[in-house]
Amino acid sequence: LCNAAVTVADSPMRVATGPLVGAWTERPEDKAGRRLDMSVLEGLDKARFSVPQWYPDYEGMYWADGNVLDVNGGGFQGIENVRVIMKAMRRVYPLAVARIADRRFNSTPASIAQNKTYFMRPLREMSRSVTILGQTFPGEIYPPEDGDITVSWPTRTSVELYMAVRPYNCPKKITCNLFLDLNNYAA
């Protein structure tokens, strides 16, 4: 993530960042000297190992998805979702600590509304696009909407915040379908 064109919302498999460098530039071989093929890597990837990958007729070695040990079907199976949530939490946490025992945060409807706006600020910042050298990079998440934050008072002196963070969809598999149309449009 030292590249300004990459954000925490990007998958490690992002090809636009460039190919791997160093020891990962060569396709691995097993002890018998056979080059590692994608079928082995796909099996390791399904078992949640981090593996390199390449694309036919496309130069370079790249990294496969950043797998984590979430349950099957869970929202945190890709590292980019974990990083987005962690970044949001790192930005919200100091705001929450600053409100401890602060009477500006109380159980009145006006205070709850004001503090929903206050705690949504980091999410609004993460949703903004940025333009670098004429290229626009989307925000890391969708802009927050009404209802994306809930304030709950389980006791008189304790508050719980629930916040929804929605990352943008991003393709990890692209299928191209081409159809040949031989109609005679000149007739």
Task: Describe each PLM feature range.
Residues L1-T17:
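Extracellular Cys-Trp
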Residues P12-V15, P19, A23-A187:
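Structured, hydrophobic secondary-structure cores that serve as assembly/anchoring elements
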